[in-house]
Amino acid sequence: MNKETRIQKIGEILARPDGSHGGIEIPWEDALKLMPVYKIPLTLLVYNKYNGRILSRTKSLEQQNHQISAETEVGRDLIEKLLWDSDPGRNKQTQNSIKKIGQEKVGIITRDGIIIDGNRRAMLLRRSGNDYFKTVVLDVTLEQNPNEIEKLETTYQMGEDEKLSYNPIEKYLKAKFLSQRGVPIDDIAKWMGETKSKIEELIAVMGTMDDYLDYLGCNGIYTQLDGREDQFITLTKQINNFKGEQSKKPFDGYKDNDVDDLRLISYDYIRVKYEGKDFRNIAYGKRENHFFGDKKIWQSFRDFHFEHVQPIKDGEEKIDFATENLTAYLNDRDNRFFEKSKNEKGKSFFTENIESHYQLIQYRKSHNEPEKLINNAIDALDAIDQGHKAFSAPMVMEKIEKINEITIKMLRRSAPERLLSHVVQMLKSIKCEDGREEKDEMLLKIKEIERVAYQMEKDIKAL
């Protein structure tokens, strides 16, 4: 049914002497106005495809070049499915209530039948076999007064009672959408029932979300933001605080390109849905509590991440935007990305990197508790299986030599006599028969030890 026919038929209902069924006050043009309520056939109504409850879904579909015409049967059925899937549990409860007592809350439509408030209710009434929708009818079309209708729609959709039932991402999209249309921040705040600073935060976080989708190569596919709101809030605060190289929370001398690395690494962790304390360990809170607060720890964490994540990304296939169910396809792609990050024991390098560097943070906090740290080191060394083939790997041997250098340095600094005792024990522990193949090299080392010992003896006697 076209627009002109809907206007005509709705107008005929409004013109009947007995057409109205009571009235309600609604905010219209900066005043509460008492408006009559009518029973309008559901066949004359058109869903609002940009309804705040499903905005992320319709925008995602349109990004895939899906044309959603709410006036067609196909478009209507698609929007009804999106409305139902937005909250099946709550929809079932409301549907049961409709079957028992009918429609409780009155809707709002334009004179040409576009639903401004009540899309979900209209869908449930249709599914319940009802024929009519109780509603106020505005005396304008959407095109005749778009700003006032947007204001009314936002006030109803994002009111305190309604916003709790919406997908969390929808409020960010709504704030962005209104801002892009030129609505002042103060007005958006009033319409959405929020403070000005909250709206500014919503728009900033939405900017991070858009950048994340661009990073993944799926711009505008807002369904990929589901379940990730808290991480985006945290990351946006971090980036805003750190940019400009003036913050005291990162390590001394950090640069904006370090902040860029932080953002990219955080995007990878957001993709695999790391959250809570694990995610905040990367760069949230006081300097001493996160990786980005210590240059050495951060660089180690960063290098490990990029070294391990890049081969996985290089092996990913290009996104097939023509796939029938893009959301399921992208979710599966993200799951496979995470699965490829796991080793033969099933542990992801994402987890390994967080855990190992979190341990370094704890070590740093215990810098004035040497006994505690040394006991931890002993326990870690005792846990090594020296019979495992990996133990003799060159990289492992280099690390052992590094440990030896550190312990010698510690003993030399505070207990030279203990160091000499340690050297004697080490010399006594050497099994000469094990060095047949390196006989000449060992003899040279022994000569060098003799020279060093002779010089030490002279120096000590001279004290």
Tell where the protein language model's regions lie, with residue ranges.
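Amphipathic alpha-helical repeat elements characteristic of tetratricopeptide repeat
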Residues: 88, 165-169, 371, 417, ...
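Tandem CBS (Cystathionine beta-synthase) repeat/Bateman regulatory domains
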Residues: 27, 53-57, 166, 174-179, ...
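Regular secondary-structure segments
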Residues: 176-180, 378, 382, 428
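Short, charged/polar connector segments at secondary-structure boundaries
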Residues: 1-134
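Active-site-proximal acidic segments at structured loop/helix or strand boundaries
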Residues: 210-233
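Amphipathic, charge-rich alpha-helical segments that serve as recognition/docking helices
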Residues: 79-84, 130-214
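C-terminal amphipathic alpha-helical interaction region
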Residues: 383-463
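Long, charge-rich C-terminal accessory regions
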Residues: 225-409
